[in-house]
């Protein structure tokens, strides 16, 4: 079983935690190609491309210009968005990190897919950014074939050949479903609000992180055991779930 997460905009590079080893991104060369393109953008151009404030555009201009010499950090440590904050890194041991390395994949606009111990540099490049290359109009077109093929090849080596989608729709769209050889289970967290079941964005993000932490700590590699998850009071609802979606409610 593999699970996918979305990369985060919030990044922290410090020495608060250590990992058992560091690996290079699978698509390092492709990421460097995109950085070469981005280094040609001015601050104003980046402000428009990334749809960010002037200060953030200036920050990321400096990041891209110094990309090759910048500090690096394992992706699982560097990302600190709402999902990644739920990973209890202070409790992780060597086996936890190595299990995550084998079972967790992070979808990234710059790197395609990352393993948790792949080292990354500071950057900002969301998946829906309309960065054009010679043969592609956007990042989806640039990455979808590469990422889909790689995930297919990786799952071929797993006993439980299932992809657990804990990423946002924006990022999971990178996978071409029609060319994916294995079942994809999307996980949804819903709760009753005003008589209707609704997904609450910030709580759903937190829940995706907590489920990921639970999977890593308990070394879950059997998709049928996912039904036992009960974080934040959620429980699996068989009547709302189907062959493509696992729904947890409270």
From Swiss-Prot:
It comes from the Bacteria. One of its GO terms (biological process) is response to hydroperoxide. GO terms for cellular component: cytosol. Pfam families: H2O2_YaaD. InterPro entries: YaaA. Belongs to the UPF0246 family. This is UPF0246 protein cce_3295. It comes from Crocosphaera subtropica (strain ATCC 51142 / BH68).
């Amino acid at each position: 079983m593999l699970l996918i997460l979305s990369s985060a905009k919030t990044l922290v590079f410090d020495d608060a935690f250590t990992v058992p080893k560091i690996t290079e991104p699978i698509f390092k060369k492709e990421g460097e190609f995109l950085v070469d393109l981005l280094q040609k953008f001015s601050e104003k151009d980046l402000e428009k491309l990334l749809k960010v404030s002037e200060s953030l555009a200036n920050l990321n201009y400096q990041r891209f210009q110094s990309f090759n010499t910048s500090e690096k950090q394992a992706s699982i440590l560097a990302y600190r968005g709402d999902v990644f904050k739920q990973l209890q890194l202070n409790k992780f041991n060597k086996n936890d990190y190595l299990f995550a390395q084998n079972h967790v994949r992070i979808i990234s606009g710059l790197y395609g897919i990352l393993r948790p111990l792949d080292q990354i540099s500071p950057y900002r490049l969301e998946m829906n950014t309309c960065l054009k290359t010679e043969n592609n109009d956007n990042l989806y077109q640039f990455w979808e074939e590469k990422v889909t093929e790689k995930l297919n090849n990786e799952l071929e080596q797993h006993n439980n050949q299932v992809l657990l989608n804990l990423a946002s729709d924006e990022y999971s769209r990178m996978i071409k479903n029609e060319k994916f050889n294995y079942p994809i289970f999307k996980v949804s967290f819903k709760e009753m609000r005003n008589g209707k079941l609704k997904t609450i964005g910030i709580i759903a993000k937190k829940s995706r992180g907590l489920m990921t932490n639970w999977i890593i700590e308990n070394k879950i590699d059997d998709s049928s055991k996912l039904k036992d998850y009960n974080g934040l009071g959620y429980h699996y609802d068989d009547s709302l779930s189907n062959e493509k979606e696992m729904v947890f409610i409270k």
